[in-house]
Amino acid sequence: MEKIPMTRAGFAALDDELKLLKTVERPAVIRAIAEAREHGDLSENAEYHAAREKQSFIEGRIKELEALLSLAEVIDPARLSGSIKFGATVTILDEETEEEKTYQIVGEAEADIENGLLNIKSPLARALIGKDEGDSIEVKTPGGERGYEVVSVRFV
């Protein structure tokens, strides 16, 4: 299987979530199922069905996290330099609005655009890869093409 690039922080966050699910959430839902069973008829027991549904979600998320972490290739951006690549923290200037935005290019599993974590497979990240400070790019968006200038590239 193909390795999934991930920052050290992204790996740690997913690993922490996995530990929480295994040590806190899973035991809690098992207790909730046991308590709900004590209330008798399971066919009309809403507490039981809700707990089983939550258990199903938790077990699915545990499997998903275990798979992601087993395929993770942790990349330390601080050891990189040069043009924009995975792990780079990039400040860009929207040529239309003159607004500056800063993003770190990360893997799919840790992407969170609202917190400045840009999915490496996104159109913007793909357009930025290989570029340097001062370069301009055009990105196709649902609202039409947008132009950006690369203001700075850092590896932190």
Swiss-Prot record:
Q: Matching Pfam families, A to Z?
A: GreA_GreB, GreA_GreB_N
Q: Which Gene3D superfamilies match?
A: Transcription elongation factor, GreA/GreB, C-terminal domain, Transcription elongation factor, GreA/GreB, N-terminal domain
Q: What UniProt keywords apply to this chain's record, in alphabetical order? A: Coiled coil, DNA-binding, Transcription, Transcription regulation
User: Coiled-coil intervals in this record?
Assistant: 46-73
Q: Name one GO molecular function term.
A: RNA polymerase binding
Has UniProt tagged this entry with the keyword Calcium?
no
Q: Which InterPro entries does the annotation name?
A: GreA/GreB_C_sf, TF_GreA/GreB_CS, Tscrpt_elong_fac_GreA, Tscrpt_elong_fac_GreA/B, Tscrpt_elong_fac_GreA/B_C, Tscrpt_elong_fac_GreA/B_fam, Tscrpt_elong_fac_GreA/B_N, Tscrpt_elong_fac_GreA/B_N_sf
- Give any single GO term for biological process: DNA-templated transcription elongation
The record's listing under HAMAP family reads: GreA_GreB
Name the family the entry cites: Belongs to the GreA/GreB family.
Q: What does this protein do?
A: Necessary for efficient RNA polymerase transcription elongation past template-encoded arresting sites. The arresting sites in DNA have the property of trapping a certain fraction of elongating RNA polymerases that pass through, resulting in locked ternary complexes. Cleavage of the nascent transcript by cleavage factors such as GreA or GreB allows the resumption of elongation from the new 3'terminus. GreA releases sequences of 2 to 3 nucleotides.
Q: What is this protein called?
A: Transcription elongation factor GreA
* Species in which this protein is naturally found: Cereibacter sphaeroides (strain ATCC 17025 / ATH 2.4.3) (Rhodobacter sphaeroides)
